Amino acid sequence: LDSNTIEIKNFGNFPSEFLKKQKKNVKFIFFEKEAKLIPHNLSDIQKNLLRGPQIISSKDIAWIIHNLDLKSGDTIIEAGGGSGALTTALAQAAYPEGKVITFEKSKKHHDIVKINLRLSPFSDQVDLRNEELNEDSPRIECNSIVLDLPEPHKLVSWAKESLVSGGKMVCYIPTINQVENLLSSLNGWGLSLIHISEPTRQDR
């Protein structure tokens, strides 16, 4: 509703000021019919994000959250905030007692994430930092780590020192060369499970 006009399918474009005045879950007359505003959900947030870097798909986000077994009370480290699509989902998964610490070294991308977090009712769970996470960064005790970076293998040592017992790490990488470098860096760390997945998406 930040736009001056809003488009509703099968109705057309009209000034958004009218809807801004309505209260959630309270009926009002709209095009001669009863209507009401309902609270937005994560899917609505994802569809309205300001675009910057390529956004992680909703299917991949769901896979990441499921495999990290995220829950309230967890501390989650995210490196590579991008446009904040994953950040908003992690924040919701960690609510109300958990927190997400997101590192984004690009000022441009950091500012995009900051703007997009305003759409989320769970933004208070996020500590957004305009910093690079690297092997020399101070260790942060955490339950989960998500790396969306070109060279995640350089952070394996940092991750091992930061993760609590039973903690998990997900690396979101697009090329087989990156996978090979990561697997090579994991040798000898005594990890209980290493899993490689290539999610596919089919919208019908």
Feature map (PLM): residue ranges:
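Conserved beta-strand signature within the Rossmann-like core of class I S-adenosyl-L-methionine
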Residues: 166-173
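Single conserved hydrophobic/aromatic residue that forms the stacking wall/gate
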Residues: 194-204
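Conserved SAM-binding loop of SAM-dependent methyltransferases across substrates and taxa
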Residues: 83-95
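S-adenosyl-L-methionine
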Residues: 105-140, 144
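A short glycine-rich, Lys/Arg-flanked "PGG" loop and its adjoining helix->strand segment in the class I
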Residues: 156-165
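Conserved SAM-binding motif I beta-strand of class I
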Residues: 99-104
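N-terminal auxiliary segments of SAM/dcSAM-dependent transferases
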Residues: 1-36
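Conserved class I S-adenosyl-L-methionine
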Residues: 73-82
